[in-house]
């Protein structure tokens, strides 16, 4: 059994906002609150990055139209004692998805980590 760091992307809607920074703050705060309410403090939440199609430089994954923002969040969780990457991904989606109901989640990376007790 191996430990994995699983990174997921979540699409978070924020209504009634006019500023990208406000939308990002609200999205990260709301996601963190919902995770903490379900005792999932170990899930890291931050704004995702999208590469610029012209220059390739990353920028914050957030878009506002009609006072509604779509914010891409990056969620990271360490999964212990998984049978493989697919198993770790399923565990991560189940853990996080249970706390963030009705929020689209997609696994974007799954990396094997070192055991701490070796």
From Swiss-Prot:
Q: Which domain of life is it from?
A: Archaea
Q: Which Pfam families match?
A: DUF555
The record ties this protein, via InterPro entries, to:
UPF0212 (IPR007564)
**Classification via NCBIfam families:** PRK03922.1 (NF003035)
Q: Which family does it belong to?
A: Belongs to the UPF0212 family.
Supply the HAMAP family for this chain. Answer: UPF0212
> What PANTHER family does this protein map onto?
UPF0212 PROTEIN MJ0068, UPF0212 PROTEIN TK1194
Report the protein name in the record: UPF0212 protein HQ_2663A
